[in-house]
Amino acid sequence: MDIQNNNNRSSFSGKIGYVLSAAGASVGLGNIWRFPYLAAKYGGGIFLLIYILLALTFGYTMIVAESAIGRMTRKSPVGAFRSFGKKKWLSFGGWINAIIPVLIVPYYSVIGGWVIKYLVEYVKGNGKNLAKDGYFTDFISNGVSTELCFIVFCLFTLGIIFAGVQNGIERVSKIMMPVLIVLSILIAVYSVTRPGALKGVRYFLVPNFDNFSWMTVVAAMGQMFYSLSIAMGILITFGSYMKKDTAIEDATRNVEVFDTAIAIMAGLMIIPAVFAFSGGNPDTLQAGPSLMFITIPKVFQNMGLGTIVGILFFLLVLFAAVTSSIALTESAVSTFEDEIGWSRKKATVYVGVIMLILGSLSSLGYGPLACVKIIGMQFLDLFDFLTNSVMMPIAALMTCLLVSRVVGIDKIEEEIRHGEGAFRRKKIFVVMIKYICPVFVLIILASSVANALGWISM
């Protein structure tokens, strides 16, 4: 075991900086366009209850494990795994955690570009055009427009990364996260007070046992896994920036609260509004881009103050996209810094080039490159399938094996005690990391692949 302290490594200023940055990484597009849909589909309050229980057990364990490994080694994923031995599977575990953000952030930035386009159009007072049938399809088919929006989002993200951990990531997160919370509350209050919206509130929050099945558990498990930024290299990287006096367990709890609160607010923003618009038809709810870029503009167009609400909503979504994209980009940049020895600026430039190349494939994949498909998928869908459905569950499994088979619980406990003096949920952590988390991860892997291939519907 070769663990060396890197005293020259960048760091967050303290607990608040880490929590807001990690929460920003967790609060992303998935909270807004996937959580409400799944909650409505799988029993409302039952789904919420299962989600919270999983976040307090499965999510807690994985966040603590990755954060502790990062702080213990003071390295990004590749170096962190390699610190515990030279076996090939350790190297594989580190590299798969490192590659995932490199593949995700390009197509994530494409979607961020779409958000910029819609925000600008609402600011210009063109909400009526956004609500027209076919607008979104026409927009993403226009290679020039989507590419320009994508590049703007990339440059904004890279500019923040250039500024560093404290002056860039932490400073932006400290501004955007509180604003994001305020916006989500304002929009949720407005949404639930619309005529006919209370039916949607009941549908979202009141348990519906008729809709409960084991797929409810699987869906909640998958959403929690992807929502908390587990297995993306982010938490290992951010853990390596965490000061020794920061309490890992307390910080983890705060991140979980932030993430779950925003997800619930997203449900209260979207489900009641869609119900009010559709007359209570739950089939109107969709997941993914269709919900955000087709259904929501139609809903806003039929609401009073639709333009103002549209501006606030897409500003909220933009902040969520930015805080997640800077976390993904930072994880990639950190790997280049650690493994090749590049400066932050040089590493950021090279990651930016990768973002532009891979992101352009996704950006143009619905326009000039629409005829190009791999295993029946557009580029954006392909990258999403490879990372979310295949690589992330494997990366999480590698982390479970690293902690339970190589590092050991005692070392993790020693690291956690640096900041708080006690490992309060040690028993839960031990049972989860050794026995339950690996099984959950394998279930997520199997269900995600089956869903992507159309064998099941989630």
Please provide the spans of the model-predicted regions.
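Membrane-interface "cap" regions at the ends of multi-pass membrane proteins
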Residues: 1-33, 62-67, 71-84, 88-92, ...
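Helix-loop-helix connectors at the membrane interface of multi-pass transporters/channels
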Residues: 2-5, 79, 112-141, 242-245, ...
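Membrane-embedded translocation segments of transport machinery
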Residues: 2-8, 12, 170, 174-322, ...
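Inter-helical loop and helix-membrane interface segments of multi-pass membrane transporters/permeases
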Residues: 6-9, 38-42, 77-96, 109-166, ...
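Select transmembrane alpha-helical segments in multipass membrane proteins
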Residues: 11-22, 46-50, 88-102, 148-153, ...
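Transmembrane helix-boundary motif of multi-pass solute transporters/channels
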Residues: 14-54, 236-239, 250-253, 257-260, ...
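Membrane-water interface regions at transmembrane-helix termini and the short interhelical loops
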Residues: 38-42, 68, 89-104, 137, ...
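A generic transmembrane alpha-helix motif of multi-pass inner-membrane proteins
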Residues: 380-402, 424-458
